[in-house]
């Protein structure tokens, strides 16, 4: 009996510590509070991830990046209705691309019937040193956006062209000749 009492006395502190440690695991842990800048960057990353995984999904089903861009254009072009001039389309694109931290745009040339502008490629860093993320290359990502914007421009009655000039996308939007 004396041995049992000694064992209880010896193990009681260990049992108490184990019980208290279990209670501590039930404490609520704080969740991270992101700054506005962190929220902005995270939101933009998620938009890019959705587009990238959409391209990947299309490819995994035997479709091309062009098919994906056309699908997105057909789906979303009606939301661009109300845009009447090339300048209006540029303004809409500018609003969308401002979502990307580090985005810059410069006007090159403008007239009543056409605009030419360029914007940088801040999304490029998402693709890392190998230029690919989630099975999609930066080239495919840009091709998908080019096809999408071409589809939207045609839907609105414009010609659209896009080319790379080092780290800039150079875009021209013109009224179609009637």
What are the functions of these language-model segments?
Residues 21-144, 151-155, 159-178:
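N-terminal accessory segment detector
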Residues 1-8:
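Bacterial N-terminal signal peptides that target proteins for export
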Residues 9-13:
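Hydrophobic helical h-region of N-terminal Sec-dependent signal peptides
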Residues 16-18:
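N-terminal signal peptide c-region/cleavage motif recognized by signal peptidases
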């Amino acid at each position: 009996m004396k041995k049992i009492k000694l064992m209880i006395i010896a193990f009681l502190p260990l049992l108490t510590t184990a019980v208290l440690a279990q209670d501590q695991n039930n404490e609520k842990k704080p969740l991270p509070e992101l700054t506005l800048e962190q929220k902005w960057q995270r939101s933009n990353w998620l938009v890019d991830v959705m587009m990238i995984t959409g391209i990947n999904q299309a490819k995994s089903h035997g479709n091309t990046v062009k098919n994906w861009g056309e699908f997105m254009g057909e789906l979303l072009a009606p939301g661009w209705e109300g845009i009447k001039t090339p300048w209006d389309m540029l303004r809409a694109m500018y609003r969308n691309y401002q979502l990307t931290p580090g985005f810059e745009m410069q006007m090159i040339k403008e007239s009543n019937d056409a605009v030419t502008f360029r914007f940088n490629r801040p999304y490029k860093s998402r693709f890392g040193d190998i230029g690919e993320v989630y099975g999609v290359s930066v080239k495919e990502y840009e091709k998908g956006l080019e096809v999408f914007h071409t589809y939207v421009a045609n839907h609105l009655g414009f010609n659209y062209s896009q080319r790379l000039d080092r780290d800039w996308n150079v875009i021209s939007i013109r009224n179609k000749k009637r």
